[in-house]
C-alpha cells in the first residue's frame, strides 16, 4: 500500500509540479484515484497558489531522440521574458540539459535540478531573471519520433509500421491538435462518466426529457472525444479522414505519445 501511494505521488508530482504533501493530500482525499485527485486540485485552485518559478510563462520546449530510437527526452525550460527565451545562450543551455538527461538517463526532476543548480544560478545572474527547469520526461519506446514547433511545442511519439514522412505528419498533428489520449478506450471511465453527467444535467435543467437529454449528451460526447482522443480527430493533412482511418489503412500502430507546450500546468496524458 505504501509503495502504491509513493508511486502515485511521484506520478502526480510529474504531472502537476506540486509538492509531495499537496499530492499526498489530494490522493488520500480521493481514494488514491489519481485522475480524481488531479480534478480535485484543478477545482481547488491549488495549482495557482505558487506564483514563483513554476509559473514562469515564457521559455522553450526541446525534444531529442537517440539514434537507435529506443529512448528520448522532452523538457520545458522557463524564463521570465520572451527576450531571454529567444537568447542563443539560453537555448543552448536547454540543449545541454536534454543531453545530460539522455546521457545519465535522469527521470527525476529534483535530481536534475540539483545536478544543474550552479548553472541555473549562473544563467539567472547572467540574464537577471528567474530560470527554471519546469518539467522533463525521459521517454522509452520501440520506434520513437520527435517533432518541435517553434521551440514552443514538443512531441515524442512511439509509432510502428510508419514511414518517416507519415511519422512526422502524425507528430505535427499531435502538436497542432493537442489530444490527451490515443483512443476513446484509453480515456479513464471516471472522466467519461463525469463529462457525460455534466451534459445530461445541463439538458435536464433546460427542461429536456431523460431520453432527449441522453441523445444530447451522446452528441456532445462525440465532440468531446474528437477534442481529446487522437484517433477521433480529423487529420490536419486530410480533413476527410480521422487519424484512426489513416492508421488503419496503413497498419500503423501508435503505442504512446507525449506533448509539452510552454506554459502548460500539466503533462499531456498518454
Swiss-Prot record:
Localisation: Cytoplasm
GO molecular function terms listed in the Swiss-Prot or TrEMBL record: translation elongation factor activity
This protein's record includes keyword Protein biosynthesis: yes
Chief location: cytoplasm
Keywords for the protein's UniProt record, in alphabetical order: Cytoplasm, Elongation factor, Protein biosynthesis
Any one of the GO CC terms: cytoplasm
Region (Involved in Mg(2+) ion dislocation from EF-Tu): 81-84
Leader sequence residues: none
Gene3D superfamilies the UniProt entry points to: 1.10.286.20, DNA helicase RuvA subunit, C-terminal domain, Elongation factor Ts, dimerisation domain
Domain of life of the organism encoding this protein: Bacteria
Family affiliation: Belongs to the EF-Ts family.
Name of the protein this chain belongs to: Elongation factor Ts
